[in-house]
Swiss-Prot record:
It holds the Pfam family Ferrochelatase. GO terms for biological process: heme biosynthetic process. NCBIfam families: hemH, PRK12435.1. Its EC number is 4.99.1.9. The gene is cpfC2. HAMAP family: Ferrochelatase. Fe-coproporphyrin III binds at Y13, R30, R46, Y47, S54, Y125. GO terms for cellular component: cytoplasm. This is Coproporphyrin III ferrochelatase 2. One of its GO terms (molecular function) is ferrochelatase activity.
Length: 319
């Protein structure tokens, strides 16, 4: 008997795979408006500063395929097929949905490689996928909407922080900054849970790592007229130093799951500039990337959704 196929739609922001792709990528982010030459060269300069191109594309593919393999090892009566859908560069989310349809996939589970729910992020990804699937008559997509408090996600970061603290002599003079990508402030007034979820993640990790000196901050804000959520991690670093005279700063960009421009430049370069300026030590624990412990975390998240799908199918088949 043939195994039932399940589509595993893994969605992420995407990144250019070469410097030649940067302009098209940036134009897509700007809703079709080409960036000025100055803005384009600034972005290209940032990529060059981290080695020429971001490792994100390679890492995202590894995460998606390793997750799919893991799911197939657990749910042996099903066949999970991997589909990668990106927000701002090919393969786009819509490409992945159309490919599932062509492959005859009738049911799919979607996961966004970002832990915190926001109308700007996870909701937007899932809406794009579900909207098209409904227009073309399938597949039925079961979305995972958030996983900011997943125990294995929390324990990953707690362990990273504990490891980092072994390198610090005066632990009372160290502070952890948990961060995520800033978004326009207007989402808060609309009741978006994004900020509260980051705070909850930070509280859970801090408790698991047994640390008292920590706070949340925001990074990589867009250059638009609208105000974005703050404080920015660089400003926050200066403020914390002025108020507490911390000697060590540990940056945990928990809103991201892989090394990419926002971590390798915005944290490892820009935040380090500030810590050098105030003569403090800079630390940034390892990102989850495609480490087996993080793949186990993602597998746990998708498995919970898969069990819901199976239970739903049983109810429908028994009626």
């Amino acid at each position: 008997m043939a195994k039932k196929k399940i589509g595993l739609l893994v969605m992420a922001y995407g990144t250019p795979e070469s410097l030649e792709d940067v302009e098209a990528y940036y134009t897509h982010i700007r809703h079709g408006r080409k960036p000025s030459e100055e803005a384009l060269q600034d972005l290209i300069g940032r990529y060059k500063a981290i080695g020429g191109i971001s490792p994100l594309a390679k890492i995202t593919k590894e995460q998606a395929h390793k997750l799919t393999d893991s799911m197939n090892n657990i749910f042996t009566e099903y066949e999970f097929n991997c589909y990668l859908g990106l927000k701002h560069i090919a393969p786009f989310i819509e490409d992945a949905v159309e490919e599932m349809k062509r492959d005859g996939i009738e049911q799919a589970i979607s996961i966004v490689l970002a832990p915190h729910y926001s109308t700007f992020s996870i909701k937007a990804y899932n809406d794009r996928a579900i909207r098209l699937s409904e227009e073309i008559g399938g597949p039925v997509i079961e979305p995972i909407e958030q996983w900011y408090d997943e125990p294995k996600f929390i324990s990953y970061w707690a362990d990273q922080i504990k490891e980092t603290f072994t390198k610090i002599e005066d632990k009372e003079k160290a502070v952890v900054i948990f961060s995520a990508h800033s978004l326009p402030e207007k989402i808060i007034a609309a009741g978006d849970p994004y900020v509260k979820q980051l705070q909850h993640t930070a509280d859970l990790i801090a408790a698991a790592a047994n640390i008292q000196n920590y706070t949340i901050g925001w990074q990589s804000a867009g250059n638009t007229p609208d105000p974005w959520i703050g404080p920015d991690v660089q400003d926050l670093t200066r403020d914390l130093f002025e108020e507490h005279r911390y000697e060590s700063f540990i940056y945990c960009p928990v809103g991201f799951v892989a090394e990419h421009l926002e971590v390798l430049y915005d944290n490892d370069y820009e935040c380090r500039v500030v810590t050098d300026e105030i003569n403090a030590a800079y630390f940034r624990p390892n990102m989850p990337n495609s480490q087996s412990i993080f793949i186990d975390c993602l597998t746990e998240i998708v498995s919970k959704k898969m069990k819901e799908v199976v239970d739903k199918d049983l109810v429908l088949n028994n009626n």
